[in-house]
Amino acid sequence: MTALNWKPFIYGGLASITAECGTFPIDLTKTRLQVQGQPNDAKYKEIRYRGMMHAIVRIWREEGVKALYSGIAPAMLRQASYGTIKIGTYQSLKRLFVDCPEDETLVLNAFCGVLSGVVSSCIANPTDVLKIRMQAQGNVMQGGMIVNFINIYQQEGTRGLWKGVSLTAQRAAIVVGVELPVYDITKKHLILSGLMGDTVYTHFLSSFTCGLAGALASNPVDVVRTRMMNQRSIRDASNSSYKGTLDCLLQTWKNEGFFALYKGFWPNWLRLGPWNIIFFITYEQLKKLNL
């Protein structure tokens, strides 16, 4: 067992922030698409956007280009905490069990990914709640990040900042438990097969593959998580559209059909794909720094 290495924590946070800034407008359209069409919520009952590109154009025209970056501050803060802990914990857990990357297995990496995803997402949940509120409600939410943090706390209490934490942890367990192992195993086999070396092209192909796998696995829980986090009035259950995560899942399926659970899939994949490509290429380049 080797000593704790600080580099994966720092590099993971920096690469996560870089990837978040590069793909944020796509993430915002995903959120808008996922919260619309809820028959039991008058505010989000209307189908305002026909797809990702239509959403981007309409938001730009009606709310301005700055609206495409609504929630970017808490998103960056989230990645500074979530991304740092996620990658650092994942890499540290792997080295706890095996000393050499060649000895890693898919099962081991998946276990480490699930655990690191749960821990990091629980810690970063308040920033995720604020990011989704600011994305979904756009210019309706007045003030900056700190003001809105305080407003959520005053109106909904501490529980409001950790609303949807179980779903966030479930989604993180799925995403991290799929993406990081798929990336590592794909990269490992490409290199060991002799088809490709440890180059940026290998990193690109591996990150593209893990982004697709993560989007397919996580989209249903992402839809439910987004709707639960965007729901308000936690202190007055009678005003809540959904009684819990299972109720949200069942109501969405019943009222809108099974494929409603894959609302926002294309922007989800089109975000996870580029996000992972930017993240892993940045991370791999940072690893090469002689620090």
UniProtKB/Swiss-Prot annotation:
Transmembrane parts of this sequence: 9-26, 71-89, 106-124, 164-183, 204-224, 264-283
Principal subcellular localisation of the protein: mitochondrion
Localization (cell): Mitochondrion inner membrane
GO molecular function: solute:inorganic anion antiporter activity; transmembrane transporter activity
Pfam families: Mito_carr
Entry superkingdom: Eukaryota
SUPFAM superfamilies (alphabetical): Mitochondrial carrier
Assigned GO CC terms: mitochondrial inner membrane
The keyword Hydrolase is annotated on this UniProt entry: no
InterPro entries registered for this protein in UniProt: Mit_carrier (IPR002067), Mito_Metabolite_Transporter (IPR050391), Mitochondrial_sb/sol_carrier (IPR018108), Mt_carrier_dom_sf (IPR023395)
UniProt KW keywords: Membrane, Mitochondrion, Mitochondrion inner membrane, Repeat, Transmembrane, Transmembrane helix, Transport
Spans of repeat Solcar: 7-96, 104-189, 198-289
Membrane topology annotation: Multi-pass membrane protein
Example GO BP: inorganic anion transport
Catalytic activity: sulfite(in) + sulfate(out) = sulfite(out) + sulfate(in); thiosulfate(in) + sulfate(out) = thiosulfate(out) + sulfate(in); sulfate(out) + phosphate(in) = sulfate(in) + phosphate(out); oxalate(in) + sulfate(out) = oxalate(out) + sulfate(in)
UniProt family annotation: Belongs to the mitochondrial carrier (TC 2.A.29) family.
Main function: Probable transporter.
Name by which UniProt lists this protein: Kidney mitochondrial carrier protein 1
Species whose genome carries this gene: Xenopus laevis
Lineage: Eukaryota, Metazoa, Chordata, Craniata, Vertebrata
Gene, per the UniProt record: slc25a30
